[in-house]
C-alpha cells in the first residue's frame, strides 16, 4: 500500500521501489508504530476529528495487528507505516484511512524511533548494572591479590587485581550516567510536528505525549522531524562503552598468553584451531574487540548522513535505522557475552604476585623513603634511578641489595628501607582516596 501517489502519472519503477523500501529493517518498529498510532488516534478523538466509535474501531484494529504480528515473511509494503495502515484498512475499512489525519510519516517515524530507543536504553542499563555488579563481586574476591600495574605496557607500580577491576567499574559507571543523561533528550515527543510545519487540527500534543510516557514535546516542528541527535548521541555512548569493553578485552587477551599467564579463559568462551591441536583462542574477547570497530562505523554512518542535510526531513535519514539497530544489537550482545566471560576466567594469583616482585616496581617507594628522610624528591628520584641501574647490572631486585651497597648511594638509608620497599607494605601504606590500598 502506498501512502502517496495522487499527483503522479507513472507508477514507481520496480528498481526504485526496491531501492526505496525500508520494510525489511524498519519492521522492528512495528510495536512502537502501533503504540504511537493508538495515542495519535486518541489525540484526534480529543480534537473532535474522530468519533468515539471510530476511535474504538481503530484502537481495536491496531491492537489486533500487534497481537497477530508474527511475520512468516517480510511484507511487500514500502515501510512499517504503510504496512500497518494497509492492515488496519483491511480490518476496519475506510475508518482506518482517517488515522493519518494531522500526521506525517516524518513525525511518525521520529516518534517510533524514540519510543524504541527508550526501551532499548532501559535494557542496556540492566546489562551495564549486571556487569558492574559482577566486577564489584570479583574485586572483593581479589582485593589483596597483588599484581603489576603498567604504564606504556611496562611494569610500573604494584596494584591489586581488585583495584584493576574497579578501574573498569568506574568506566562503566560513567557509561551508565551517560545513559541517564541521554534519556532527557531521547524522551521528547515530535509527534504533532507534521511533515515540517505542524497541523491545522487542534491536537493536544501534551496529552498525546502523556499517553506515550514522554517527559516533554519538541517545540519546533522543523527540528522535531529532522532531529537525529538522539541517534548520534546513543551511538556515541555505544562507541565509548564498546571502547571500554575493547580495552578490557585487549588486556585479557594479553594476560591469557603464556608470556603473561595471569589468567585462563574458560572453554565456554574459547575456540580451537582447525590445524593446530594445542590452540585455545580467546575468541569471545577478540570478537568484542573487533565489533568495537563495527559500532564506530555505525556512528560514522549517521554522522556522515546528517552532515550536509538542509532542514527539514530528507530521505537520507532513512539510513539512520540500520546503523542504530546494528549499534544496539552489537552493544547488547557484547555486554552479555563479556559479563558471562569475565565471570568464568581462572585468575592465576600466584603468577600475578610473582610478576609483581620483579621489574623494580618498588623504585618509586624507594624514592619516597628517601624523601621521608629529608631528601628533596627530585634528588631522591635520581638516587633511586641509580640504585635501579646498579641492581639491573647485578640481576638483583632492590630489596636483595645489601644495606652496605645501598648506603653507597646515600648515607640516610637505614635498615628500615627493606620494610619501606616490601611489595605488600607498599600497598598497605597507600593513603590517598582511590589508591590500591591493602588493609
Curated annotation (Swiss-Prot):
Q: In which pathway is this protein known to take part?
A: Amino-acid biosynthesis; L-arginine biosynthesis; L-arginine from L-ornithine and carbamoyl phosphate: step 3/3
Q: What is its EC number?
A: 4.3.2.1
**What's the chief localization of this chain?**
cytoplasm
Give a yes or no for keyword Lyase in this entry. yes
What is the reaction catalyzed? Answer: 2-(N(omega)-L-arginino)succinate = fumarate + L-arginine
Source superkingdom: Bacteria
Classification via Pfam families: ASL_C2, Lyase_1
Q: Which GO terms describe its biological process?
A: arginine biosynthetic process via ornithine; L-arginine biosynthetic process
CDD domains associated with the record: Argininosuccinate_lyase
Q: Does the keyword Cytoplasm apply?
A: yes
Subcellular localization: Cytoplasm
Q: Which Gene Ontology cellular component annotation is one that this UniProt entry carries?
A: cytosol
InterPro entries for the chain: Arg_succ_lyase_C, Argininosuccinate_lyase, Fumarase/histidase_N, Fumarate_lyase_CS, Fumarate_lyase_fam, Fumarate_lyase_N, L-Aspartase-like
Keywords from the UniProt entry:
Amino-acid biosynthesis, Arginine biosynthesis, Cytoplasm, Lyase
Name any one GO molecular function: argininosuccinate lyase activity
- What family does this belong to? Belongs to the lyase 1 family. Argininosuccinate lyase subfamily.
Q: Which PANTHER family match?
A: ARGININOSUCCINATE LYASE (PTHR43814:SF1)
Record-given protein name: Argininosuccinate lyase
Amino acid at each position: 500500500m502506498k501512502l502517496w501517489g495522487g499527483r503522479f502519472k507513472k507508477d514507481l519503477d520496480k528498481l526504485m521501489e526496491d531501492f526505496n523500501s525500508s520494510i525489511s529493517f524498519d519492521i522492528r518498529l512495528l510495536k512502537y508504530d502501533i503504540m504511537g498510532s493508538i495515542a495519535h488516534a486518541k489525540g484526534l478523538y480529543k480534537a473532535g476529528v474522530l468519533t468515539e466509535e471510530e476511535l474504538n474501531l481503530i484502537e481495536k484494529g491496531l491492537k489486533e495487528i500487534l497481537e497477530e504480528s508474527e511475520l512468516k515473511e517480510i511484507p511487500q509494503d514500502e515501510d512499517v507505516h504503510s504496512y500497518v495502515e494497509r492492515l488496519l484498512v483491511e480490518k476496519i475499512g475506510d475508518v482506518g484511512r482517517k488515522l493519518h489525519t494531522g500526521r506525517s510519516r516524518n513525525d511518525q517515524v521520529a516518534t517510533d524511533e524514540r519510543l524504541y530507543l527508550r526501551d532499548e536504553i532501559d535494557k542496556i542499563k540492566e546489562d551495564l548494572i549486571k556487569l558492574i555488579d559482577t566486577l564489584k563481586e570479583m574485586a572483593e574476591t581479589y582485593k589483596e591479590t597483588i599484581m603489576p600495574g603498567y604504564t606504556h605496557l611496562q611494569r610500573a607500580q604494584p596494584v591489586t587485581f581488585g583495584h584493576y577491576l574497579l578501574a573498569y567499574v568506574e568506566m562503566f559507571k560513567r557509561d551508565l550516567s551517560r545513559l541517564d543523561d541521554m534519556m532527557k533528550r531521547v524522551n521528547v515527543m515530535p509527534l504533532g510536528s507534521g511533515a515540517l510545519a505542524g497541523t491545522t487540527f487542534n491536537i493536544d500534543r501534551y496529552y498525546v505525549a502523556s499517553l506515550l510516557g514522554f517527559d516533554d514535546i519538541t517545540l519546533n516542528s522543523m527540528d522535531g522531524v529532522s532531529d537525529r541527535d538522539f541517534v548520534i548521541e546513543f551511538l556515541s555512548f555505544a562507541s565509548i562503552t564498546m571502547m571500554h569493553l575493547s580495552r578490557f578485552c585487549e588486556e585479557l587477551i594479553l594476560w591469557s598468553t603464556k608470556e603473561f599467564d595471569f589468567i585462563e579463559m574458560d572453554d565456554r568462551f574459547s575456540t580451537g584451531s582447525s590445524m593446530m591441536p594445542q590452540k585455545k583462542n580467546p575468541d569471545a574477547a577478540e570478537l568484542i574487540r573487533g565489533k568495537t570497530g563495527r559500532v564506530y562505523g555505525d556512528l560514522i554512518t549517521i554522522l556522515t548522513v546528517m552532515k550536509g542535510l538542509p532542514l527539514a526531513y530528507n530521505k537520507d535519514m532513512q539510513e539512520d535505522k540500520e546503523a542504530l539497530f546494528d549499534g544496539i544489537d552489537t552493544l547488547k550482545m557484547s555486554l552479555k557475552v563479556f559479563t558471562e566471560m569475565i565471570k568464568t576466567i581462572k585468575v592465576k594469583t600466584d603468577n600475578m604476585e610473582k610478576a609483581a616482585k620483579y621489574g623494580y616496581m618498588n623504585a618509586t617507594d624507594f624514592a619516597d623513603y628517601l624523601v621521608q628522610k629529608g631528601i628533596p624528591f627530585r634528588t631522591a628520584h635520581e638516587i633511586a634511578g641509580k640504585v635501579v641501574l646498579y641492581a639491573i647490572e647485578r640481576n638483583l631486585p632492590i630489596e636483595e641489595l645489601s644495606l652496605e651497597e645501598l648506603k653507597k648511594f646515600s648515607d640516610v638509608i637505614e635498615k628500615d628501607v627493606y620494610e619501606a620497599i616490601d611489595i605488600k607494605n607498599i600497598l598497605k601504606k597507600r593513603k590517598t582516596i582511590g589508591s590500591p590500598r591493602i588493609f
